[in-house]
Amino acid sequence: MERMFSTRLAPLAFSLSALFLAGCNEDTAQPAALASMVIPVCVNDECLVLDQNGAMLVNGDNTYAVTLSIPLNNTFIFAEDGQWNLANANGSQIIKPNFTDGLRLLTPGYFGFERDGKFGVMDQQGNEVQAPAYDEIYSGGDLPPGMGQYIVYGIDEKFGLLGADGHVVTEPLFDSLTTYKDIALAGGWILAERDAQNWVINLQTGETKQVGFDKFDEYANDHFVVSLGSKKGLADASNKLLTDLKYYWMGIPGNGLVAFKENHDSLCGYLDFQGKVAIAPAYAECEVFGQKGAMVKPKTDDGGKGKFSFIARTGQALTEPTFDWVGPAVHAPMGMFKNAPGYTQTGTLQNMFVAYYGIFDTDKGIELLKPEYVQVGVLTPDLFVFAKPDSPTKTVTFLGAANQQPTLGVMNASGKVLIEPGQYLNITLDKSGRFIRAMTESTRQTNTALYDLKGKLLVPAQWQEVVVDEARGALFAYALEGTPNDETRSLRALYSLNGTPSFQTRTVGCDVQQVIDGSGKVVWPTDPENFCGEPEDDEAADAQ
């Protein structure tokens, strides 16, 4: 097992979270075979090492205190006598013995190690990419340790950047560093503070420059919404300000326009990407522009309780006011919806307490799904999450109150159901754009299944986390336990991208974990009864 954020000899962890709309077209290519890997697996407080086919490289009957349960190419890291060691695939050669007692998970295949009170960077072959010279080192980006997008290092309370492979991007000049979500979604830019001044750093080019804002609020259509304190403005992809920082609110940039409000009680309108007013403020609410238009709620005399209509880039109304509510089209639990470029979710009230929802295509200016669903959202241009009024429900407790929440399914644009409602409360598109994640509950530590875009089940909902590794052709399944700040994760199964199992664990006998290969053949332990504790003699205990 691995424990998150620990720097000493203790388990360590990382995880992935799902993003949206990474792929718009279904990938029909045949998945690549599993890459060659060395995979430590820990069960029953013992650790064995497998290859990508589930064959055993190192038996579980060994002297290792723990192994780092991270798949590497041809090595693995284990602890013994309070020190971390790097070994070859079958453990017959110790490549880097006793190299540290302070290990950090950084980026894939790269690790921080401590020596004489200083940290350096090591690759998975044991090469010291950066010699120990740093007071501090950790992974950077909006991803957990071990899956970082870059590396942050500190010297004398100043911080600098290393690339994902450990090369120097900046000198240690900065007091703080901030990432906007996934840096890949923000052109590689990172915000930094240096001597009370605001800077941006481009991780890809190494460019640094001073800017007049201190926060990225949104990034879309190659433009940023940025802010300084409570005032917002628009910047281009190079972080050049296109407007003054004077707006109370700005929406998400889309198709050359961005919504704005100058003050809290102002009406909203739209700016173009030159910072000029394209549609004068005349609306109570303004949504993101698609290629054809955007949804707006006109100002009314009854306190803004009118309906939404669809307008063109000229401001001309293209539809009559129709919808009681509109919002982002990516479904998420608890109403925390996210933007889907080119789509808007629509809603119509059925009575004071019930609303039905649909999907409007703002690129084409057409209604894709009429408001007939109690929940709906976009996965891809041809796939939608949905729940109908008669869909099965599950009991969900939130803030101590129990209520019934509809279960979700997946259908295509023609209405064909690919995943029936009944089991899942949350369904999202995987970051790769090639897979669908389906969660049985709304919490982080819920069982997660993985499907392909045709609705084929690849990984059953037996474990709490499924990591997609396209480069290796692998799907890794992990069990999660503990609180978010003290979480452990244990590798429990490996599948190919088409859902063929390579190995998995199962519970047998007296709750003993047993590893089996893809054909169901036992790998280890072959004698699970030996891991059962001695039965207690209750009568003898009572007699004493």
Which residues make up each language-model segment?
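C-terminal motif of bacterial Sec signal peptides marking the signal peptidase cleavage site
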Residues: 20-23
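Residue-level detector of conserved, function-critical positions
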Residues: 25-544
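Bacterial N-terminal signal peptides that target proteins for export
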Residues: 2-12
